[in-house]
Amino acid sequence: MTNFFNRSPKHQSHHYQPHQQDVTDISYSMENVSISSNAMMDIDTSYRSSKPTYNNPQQQQQQQQQQQAQNNLFNKENITPLNSPTKSILHNSPQQAKSSTSPQHLYNKLVNANYNGNSPQPGIQQQQNNRALQNNINQLQPPLNKRYKLTEAEFYAKANSARTKRLTSIAQLYFLDYYCDMFDYVINRRERTAIVEKNLLTDPMYKNDITKQQFEWKNYIGRERALLRKRRLKPKHKDFEMITQIGQGGYGQVFLSRKRDTREICALKILNKKLLIKLDETRHVLTERDILTNTRSDWLVKLLYAFQDQEKVFLAMEFVPGGDFRTLLNNTGYLIPPHARFYISEMFAAVNSLHELGFTHRDLKPENFLIDSKGHIKLTDFGLAAGTVCNDRIESMKIKLQNLQNLNDFNDDSNNDNHHYQVPSSLIYERQKIFKQSQQQQQQQNSNNTTANSIVGSPDYMALEVLEGKNYNYTIDYWSLGCMLFEALCGYPPFSGSKQDETYYNLKHWKTALRRPQTKDGRYVFSDRTWNLIIKLIASPNNRLQNFKQVQQQSYFSDIKDWGNLRQKTPPFTPQLDNEEDAGYFDDFEDDEMMMKYKDVFARQEQNEQLLEKSNTTTTTTTTTTTKNGKRFSPGSKFNDNFIGFTFKHKSNPNNKFTNGSGNTGRYGNGNGNNNNNGEINLLNMVENGNGIGNGNSRSSRLNPLATLY
């Protein structure tokens, strides 16, 4: 493989530094600029005449030295990077002596060449020539704001920018993936061809019948051709059949979908491209896409397809049918210690898989952990449809935290009992009651409000250093997991208050607010090893557990002998599913009562759409193609530039598989239908509506089996 990406021999002979070599190659590859005959008629080409005569050798030597100096200057000035806004075209103009002023632009040189200075008002022929010249210049010139050449410092700053590095990585991965996939396809095709030829020559059914051999060979070639065409197709929105909505966010929706040709079930996220760009959320979408395409872990939700059109971006992800961990907690109230240990251990393993990819979540919540069909945990939502971890949200929460400094004054007012702040109670039943009341009040506020609430959210699980704007590392996710373990065992987060302001104040004074829960008779709810783990997770950055190995060594996890075998253990809860389209563990978006808790989300979405519509009215955009720098482009293409390298198709896509006309595999297996155990698809006789598929419309509420244990 490496031989396909080596430099050519002509480049290997140079011994420049890497960046100098690239710049030199680019400068040598610049094309000459061609000008029409009408323009060339008026350009002074006297400098191309025969060599001048010199009166004496000294004058000739002096002229040659000046010429050599000018040539050196010319060579230095015209080494321009390929992605510079302008390409040097001075080598088509006369070389003049070096002046103290900046070099004259080619446009001015050509215009000056058209006027001889004697006729200030040119005639009709001259005007026609000038118009022809101007048309050529318009094609040669860059935009007005980019008429300069990048300096060396600007060029290398641009080359080392995060955007350039990402595009470079995308290009490298694209070509490596393309050639590896192509070689894999060619090798498999040769193997299939050899098997077909062998069967046609040895099978008694075809051995002595030339007509049947030709017929079967023609069918085989047709299936290979169909497979090759399928491989070239890019996914589109119309390729997916929408079954039901399972999620809603400020930037788009999530639908349970089925891909029409491969019959794959997926969760399809549909996001408004213009809104993402307007609210500066493009980076979060690309981060989500990069994480999902790089992961091979069973702990992270997998990406199946990523594609876009002029208005939307689409992420077709693995459908995890068991609902989220928040739903599990709502159904049970709290978990018994063995069950809590099972789930928190899997959460640590999932978060560690994310950290190994070089990413930090920053805003882990029970809603981010899904339960798959076998009852195990998968991590999702890395900052996408629900606007998770957007910088605006963190900044607004930071301001909210700073504004609560005024609450300190209440402690000095002994005559004002209403404003006097008290440390949260350690009694578990009191805190559970307060937490339930605060949730009910929040739902009531959402149902009464007709406009979107502030972007500020509750910081129940977010580490303090994130809100304070301080430097942080991936251990902030350990803080969040500590808060979730606390809630799983007690039924409320450690810093929850009766009002949101109290929650912020508890977080700001977390060392005082974090108290070990007790029952009425004074017994501690947590065991010693459980409490020791929590205070090592919810701790200052220097005292917090620093890596996954330290987490595994805690006495709380002493019963776990093999962390690599977690997914083979029997979970305490397994979703009861009717079929692969069963979305019963997700909210029913056709139920008006259930949608009351999404009222804030819908209002925020409406507010975003109004903001986008307002910006569209102030900006004149056309749907027709226009001309820019001599090139035709569509106005919508500027949005695609923000999502370069977004398209993705997973390797196990059934369109990359091969089957014969009867449903058998390309290796003449024993399949007998359109879908076989290997997930391979019959490309010729595909049935649009598969058999044995349920309607998937059962959205009745489910009784969590764990609820009977508490």
Curated annotation (Swiss-Prot):
rRNA-binding as UniProt keyword: no
Keyword field: ATP-binding, Cell cycle, Cell division, Cytoplasm, Cytoskeleton, Kinase, Nucleotide-binding, Nucleus, Phosphoprotein, Serine/threonine-protein kinase, Transferase
Basic residues: compositionally biased ranges: 8-17
GO molecular function terms listed in the Swiss-Prot or TrEMBL record: ATP binding; protein serine kinase activity; protein serine/threonine kinase activity
Enzyme class: transferase
Biological process (GO), any one: mitotic spindle organization
Chain spans, region Disordered: 1-20, 46-103, 613-636, 651-674
Primary role: Ser/Thr-protein kinase involved in the mitotic exit network (MEN) and required after the metaphase to anaphase cell cycle transition. Required for proper nuclear segregation, mitotic spindle organization, actomyosin ring contraction, primary septum assembly, and normal hyphal morphogenesis.
Protein name: Cell cycle protein kinase DBF2
Taxonomic source organism: Candida albicans (strain SC5314 / ATCC MYA-2876) (Yeast)
